[in-house]
């Protein structure tokens, strides 16, 4: 897969950071020592963690060399490791595992989430936020365009669901706080929606296409977005973006 583009990702930095801020606000830990930021990207979520716990040892994990380089440049006081979340092993038990908009890219959450809980110290916390927009027009249309143009399905899997995550984490020995929030982002144009998803959800669909194929895909995608997202009275577009939040505290 082609590498992530930090500049494109940070184009909507405020919108992408807001869920991390709101997730962090629900983590009731005080003096903690070891933190992992899984899927840290360019370090915007890591910066929030460092601001709240400046004395903690924070390790950011990401599989993208470009994202890791950007994060290291922005936060020289934190450790950043290029690794696959599924294979990375900390040197010590973690007081907090923070995963903002990263775990949705990984398969088999029935195994992944108990594994992450096993990395926590007693009373440690797993804090997770995942986009829950698999059924939103932005993502449904990606699949429809790919089908129209005879491209394979390269999208991520849908989330397991609120009840499934509650059971998975309860059985792993956690107290679970889980909620879902829908954000309505004001977009100036349909092209702005494409700019947003090109940095994330559209990447797998476009990565193996030629430049002309990508343009053909995006032209059709733009047409379909216009049909699904009407303009407001002031010309703006409201982009609904549901997100699932989980704060699980280990009790064992």
From Swiss-Prot:
Localization: Cytoplasm
GO biological process, alphabetically ordered: methylation
GO CC annotation, single: cytoplasm
Spans traversing the lipid bilayer: none
Keyword annotations from UniProtKB, A to Z: Cytoplasm, Methyltransferase, S-adenosyl-L-methionine, Transferase
Major site of localization recorded for this protein: cytoplasm
Keyword Transport: no
Record GO terms (molecular function): trans-aconitate 2-methyltransferase activity
Record-listed E.C. numbers: 2.1.1.144
Catalytic activity line of the entry: trans-aconitate + S-adenosyl-L-methionine = (E)-3-(methoxycarbonyl)pent-2-enedioate + S-adenosyl-L-homocysteine
Family: Belongs to the methyltransferase superfamily. Tam family.
Described function: Catalyzes the S-adenosylmethionine monomethyl esterification of trans-aconitate.
Stated name of the protein: Trans-aconitate 2-methyltransferase
Biological source species: Escherichia coli O45:K1 (strain S88 / ExPEC)
The organism's taxonomic lineage, starting at the top: Bacteria, Pseudomonadati, Pseudomonadota, Gammaproteobacteria, Enterobacterales
């Amino acid at each position: 897969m082609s590498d992530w583009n930090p500049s494109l990702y940070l184009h909507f930095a405020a919108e992408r950071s807001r869920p991390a801020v709101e997730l962090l606000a629900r983590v009731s830990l005080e003096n903690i020592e070891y933190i992992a930021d899984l899927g840290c990207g360019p370090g915007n979520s890591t910066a929030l963690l460092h601001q709240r716990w400046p004395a903690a040892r924070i390790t950011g994990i990401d599989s993208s060399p470009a994202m890791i380089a950007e994060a290291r440049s922005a936060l020289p006081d934190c450790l950043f490791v290029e690794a696959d979340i599924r294979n990375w092993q900390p040197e010590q038990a973690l007081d907090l595992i923070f995963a903002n908009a990263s775990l949705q890219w990984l398969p088999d959450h029935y195994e992944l989430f108990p594994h992450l809980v096993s990395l926590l110290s007693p009373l440690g916390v797993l804090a997770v936020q995942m986009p829950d927009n698999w059924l939103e027009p932005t993502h449904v249309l990606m699949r429809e365009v790919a089908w129209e143009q005879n491209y394979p399905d390269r999208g991520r899997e849908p989330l397991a669901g609120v009840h499934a995550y509650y059971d998975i984490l309860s059985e792993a020995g956690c107290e679970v706080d889980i909620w879902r929030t829908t954000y309505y982002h004001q977009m100036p144009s349909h092209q702005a929606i494409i700019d947003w998803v090109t940095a994330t959800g559209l990447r797998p669909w476009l990565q193996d296409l030629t430049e002309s194929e990508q343009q053909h895909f995006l032209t059709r995608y733009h047409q379909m977005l216009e049909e699904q997202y009407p303009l407001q009275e002031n010309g703006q577009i409201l982009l609904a973006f549901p997100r699932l939040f989980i704060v699980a505290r280990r009790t064992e």
